[in-house]
């Protein structure tokens, strides 16, 4: 097997502009200056004012000035001492609780360790003109804003200086006129009443209209949801194509992008509600027990293991310089709609779909609600929350405001606690933030490297910010910095510790310069990680584990202590990262490096109306599949491939039991080890039909079965009546080709004539009306059996050979085939066991069972049904025989046409050589190609190579297949491959397990139960 690694590597160069350093790059210049000032400020008074001896003063300096200087030199949490003190003072000024049950302005001191903590009082904005400017001051200037501002200043006429007295008089005059002048706001808005929830006022969101978030600093933000793909299991070539497509999007995307990954416990309430509705319709008590067990199992696994992720692409409107303020809103709406359309088209080339909701406003509010109220949204949908908010407004007597309730009221949490420096608390959930600093990135990364963070686990969210910079300015800065660094390295010795840093900066500069010359764009990347937990201990543990995970990948992360509020606001889907955090974490990269951060890498399969298969091994999401959903899957067929002992029978029965729970008729054809299906069949009230020489069950292969066509006639109207006799004889030719593989063309013709004569003896002709029994209206006549055909074949020398071969089924050991049908297929769970048949009879028996089931499946096109064909290679064995080719065509017919009858065919095979070799692989590959969903279990190396070629799997996927443990597999559907661990409840496991050790445990447990029951009776 070829395991050659041909994955592309992308470069994320170090920042080409770094702050100055001293002492060979050991300390930052700011830290050294602050340490010197602090040491001087402390040392001079200590040394000069204390009336002590020289030794005592030196000791005093070592105890005071030296520690302070060392602290300033090293810094705190990566910040300089002065910067940290400013952050801490700002935190002390702003620490508060917003919202909560108390309406007072201050929280009692006893609740917070004796400290008087004020709640934030929200004041209306007095200067709307200035708010727009001040809101943008926290963010880096875009494009040539600074340069254009300087040019405008230079072009303005220079005013002559007035004398001081004239200036003073002018100021007083201006002040008086200002007081008399009535202020006019730039933007006419209706005065907004205060929200009932203070948190709703606190959030930097003005309103949500037209699917757009209007921020309080007058920006327009759009949020769209993106469906991810299973990127990491794609081949190297597929990954390369996806990255190229993402590069194309980045080149024409908005200047600022925020990609948010929201992780939470799986939302399974809709699936559970579907299960409960199905339980109400179930009449079989044994199936009800299975459904209750399934319900408990899904709740258990959903609360303990299952995780779901949502991916959001967020961008803002970028106004042109010539846009009029009056037209800005309309221009923003059109521009953002165009941006959504562009993202949809380009991301579709990557394999991603952009979800287009019916109501954009409701979708946007729901996103914010799920983000801000994680605990509440898990149990209370947005519609219920909206009703509660309306009820609160009515209770407060604010009936007139019902139609104008701010959108933030529906999504804001009840309270936010900013009183802790290391975390914040929102409605009982604890939040902490990690920032990847500028020097915390790897220089060489593979495509999709962010999947490490995306799939980190429950309670780990990620925000990625990309900001495209003006190319002309960056080229100028890179050239200037290159010249500075080259002059530095001339003066530095190669033994200095900062030599490598300068050399790296020079290499980075040349890399950026070359990339910019090759039409790449320049970006700044920021990564912010949100960690949530239900208590402080879990939060600290998750923060520690996340740091370890990043360190294992040569990455680094720093905490946002005393800046948790700024991190919280930055993590909102508003494309607005706080300036200090932005500067601390920005890392320069080119378009290729930005595309390597492709984050939509965690594919999930979760259909609310489906059946649970297991848990995704890579991201712990639930795999709930509804193969009958024609909007997602082109057909409901499935192929299960695996070596002996890999778990094919277990997987088949697990699916069959869970489909039966959904009231879907199940038919299982078991050519080998049919007894393994008996335990589950009997425990759900199913019908176990055993076809063997020693069994009383019989299926008359010559029976023309009555098919209910009432549904088809209602759908299509009266149809052309085709001869049912001709169709049956066509099927019988396949049967006899399997029974007599060396049948000549002449014998085939004579057999056809004999079959027509046999049916004629019972009064059946090509006229369908002849099938009706005159004595019993509504029923068919008594059908001929093989013995009737045998008698006709004996009458001619030309057909005597066929009669001798048929004699075994008429008068020999397999005479059970020579009886009328005495079984029914009206049970919802039917197993046809033909494992007692051996040799050529096994193939014949398998065809008889399939023919019987196929007639039943074609009855009602509106009814979902599933046919499980275990070890289908048995029907395809003996390559080269004409009969086997007919049998292969019959299987292909089932695979190709069952979709039109509302059904699904699930094929399982372990002998892949026979499966793929017959007729050059036409039948095996035909079945695979007509199965939209494939489940690949453990395979040997040579078999894995066959499957790799047939399914176009990557080397990584093929290697995984050869190392699968029992109960693990790969699901391939809709161009996505998912590694899954199949999960069964204890009750299901007892019914379908074939493991010898587990069977022994079941036997011992039942014996203990019997002995306990016997003792109780005594």
What does each model-identified segment do?
Residues 51-66, 633:
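Hydrophobic alpha-helical transmembrane segments
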Residues 202-207, 212-213, 222-230, 236-255, ...:
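P-loop NTPase motor domains
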Residues 951-1007:
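Conserved P-loop NTPase
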Residues 61-68, 77-82, 87, 91, ...:
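Extended, folded cores of ATP/NTP-driven motor/assembly subunits in large transport
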Residues 909:
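H-loop/switch region of ABC-family ATPase nucleotide-binding domains
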Residues 685-688, 922-936:
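A short helix-turn-beta junction within AAA+ P-loop NTPase domains corresponding to the substrate/partner-engaging
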Residues 19-47, 205-209, 214, 247, ...:
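Glycine-rich phosphate-binding loop of nucleotide-binding enzymes
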Residues 1-15:
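Short, charged cytosolic
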